[in-house]
């Protein structure tokens, strides 16, 4: 299973690297949008590597316990930040909305909470024998993850509505797929498919947003004529 997972992670990292290159070379994205996508892809890659580290060091000699704790902390802590990066991408304007600032503050508070509760093993624990285990309050991580995904879904639907985009309903099956995959991962933690699915969905989300933004005229910022004709028809 470990060898299979390592191969999947290698493929995962290749796809993310390609998406980073594609984002940097894009002529349709502004600097803010490029920054958001690049940060999202980088975070997914980082968390994917952290998951590999946790698998390698779990059950290893106690000298690696600190690495096991650190990798799990960063993995659990940074996960809700991925949807926030994608929300940041949605608005082409440089002004950051208050609700987004509040969401970032919640992420910061969550990181502090996670760090403060490490000695008590509320969300997760690593024994003296260097064995990982979920804590009694593991649901806090799950709640933060789902809350971030819900925020992304709502923000995407609201943005797509402004484009009169008939494909805006596609965000629901994407979110449903990710939610179902997360439930499977929680029920069967040995599968390790979460971040492969997140990578796939981030690529689909990139395509979805690109199609949506391409409906705008580059000069006026309004729906282009071809889109207007289709709306009338």
Predicted regions span which residues?
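Membrane-water interface at transmembrane helix exits
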Residues: 50, 54, 87-91, 95, ...
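Alpha-helical transmembrane segments in multipass membrane proteins, preferentially the mid-helix core
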Residues: 18-23, 84-89, 142-163
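Conserved nucleotide-binding and Mg2+-coordinating catalytic segments in signaling enzymes
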Residues: 210-233
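Interfacial "cap-and-anchor" motif at the non-cytosolic start of specific transmembrane alpha-helices
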Residues: 2, 159-213
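Extracellular-loop-to-transmembrane junctions of the mid-late helices
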Residues: 2-12, 113-151, 185-191
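Non-cytosolic membrane-interface motifs at loop->transmembrane helix junctions
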Residues: 63-73, 127-138, 194-198
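Transmembrane helix-loop junctions in multipass membrane proteins, especially transporters and channels
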Residues: 28, 56-63, 91-94, 119-127, ...
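Hydrophobic alpha-helical transmembrane segments of multi-pass membrane proteins
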Residues: 7-64, 68-85, 101-121, 171-186
């Amino acid at each position: 299973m470990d060898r299979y997972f390592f191969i999947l992670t290698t493929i995962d990292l290749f796809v993310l690297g390609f998406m980073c290159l594609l984002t940097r070379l894009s002529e349709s994205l502004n600097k803010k949008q490029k920054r958001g996508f690049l940060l999202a892809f980088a975070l997914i890659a980082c968390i994917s590597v952290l998951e590999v580290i946790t698998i390698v060091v779990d059950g290893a000699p106690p000298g690696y316990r600190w690495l096991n704790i650190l990798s799990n902390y960063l993995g659990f802590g940074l996960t809700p930040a991925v949807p926030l990066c994608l929300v940041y991408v949605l608005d082409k304007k440089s002004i950051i909305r208050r609700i987004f600032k509040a969401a970032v503050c919640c992420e910061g508070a969550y990181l502090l909470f996670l760090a403060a509760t490490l000695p008590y093993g509320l969300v997760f624990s690593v024994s003296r024998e260097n064995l990982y285990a979920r804590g009694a309050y593991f649901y806090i991580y799950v709640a933060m993850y789902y809350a971030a995904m819900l925020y992304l879904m709502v923000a995407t639907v609201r943005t797509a509505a402004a484009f009169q985009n008939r494909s805006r309903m596609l965000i629901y099956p994407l979110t449903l797929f990710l939610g179902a995959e997360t439930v499977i991962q929680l029920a069967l933690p040995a599968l390790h498919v979460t971040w492969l699915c997140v990578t796939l969905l981030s690529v689909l989300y990139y395509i979805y947003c690109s199609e949506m933004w391409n409906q705008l005229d580059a000069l006026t910022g309004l729906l282009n004529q071809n889109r207007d004709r289709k709306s009338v028809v």
